[in-house]
């Protein structure tokens, strides 16, 4: 489960490598984030010369989760890591590339640009 203080891998080319979750968006009592949920996070590790720097506060969407998500047909989708993509305020990614597979649930939550950039949608 992704919650406050969780650390996530960054699955794009913005220059950030790791994020620390500050808040899960969606109300003051919202505790956990799953695939397709927006979070506010800070950059804990970044490569030099990237778009974002260490210490920047960013919005991101969770694209892979170890806990996984239940689908309408009863199946589950789970991943080996928790990963997020840094986004702008209009739900478009800050980076120009997405690394690794993303879940189909992002299409239902209207993150079309992330889905189109991803190399694989599971």
Swiss-Prot record:
It comes from the Bacteria. One of its GO terms (biological process) is translation. Gene3D superfamilies: Ribosomal protein L14. GO terms for cellular component: cytosolic large ribosomal subunit. Keywords: Ribonucleoprotein, Ribosomal protein, RNA-binding, rRNA-binding. The keyword Ribosomal protein applies. Coiled coil: none annotated. SUPFAM superfamilies: Ribosomal protein L14. One of its GO terms (molecular function) is structural constituent of ribosome. InterPro entries: Ribosomal_uL14, Ribosomal_uL14_bac-type, Ribosomal_uL14_CS, Ribosomal_uL14_sf. Part of the 50S ribosomal subunit. Forms a cluster with proteins L3 and L19. In the 70S ribosome, L14 and L19 interact and together make contacts with the 16S rRNA in bridges B5 and B8. Binds to 23S rRNA. Forms part of two intersubunit bridges in the 70S ribosome. Belongs to the universal ribosomal protein uL14 family. PANTHER family: 50S/60S RIBOSOMAL PROTEIN L14/L23, LARGE RIBOSOMAL SUBUNIT PROTEIN UL14M. This is Large ribosomal subunit protein uL14. It comes from Agathobacter rectalis (strain ATCC 33656 / DSM 3377 / JCM 17463 / KCTC 5835 / VPI 0990) (Eubacterium rectale). The gene is rplN.
């Amino acid at each position: 489960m992704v919650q406050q203080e969780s650390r996530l891998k960054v699955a794009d080319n913005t220059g950030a490598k790791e994020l620390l979750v500050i808040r899960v968006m969606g109300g003051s009592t919202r505790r956990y984030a799953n695939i397709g949920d927006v979070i506010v996070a800070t950059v804990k590790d970044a490569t030099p010369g990237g778009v974002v720097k260490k210490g920047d506060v960013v919005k991101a969407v969770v694209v892979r989760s170890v806990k996984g998500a239940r689908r309408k047909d009863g199946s589950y989708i789970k991943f080996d890591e928790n990963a997020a993509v840094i986004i702008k305020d209009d739900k478009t990614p800050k980076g120009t590339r997405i690394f690794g597979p993303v879940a189909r649930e992002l299409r239902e939550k209207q993150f079309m640009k992330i889905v189109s950039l991803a190399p694989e949608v599971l």
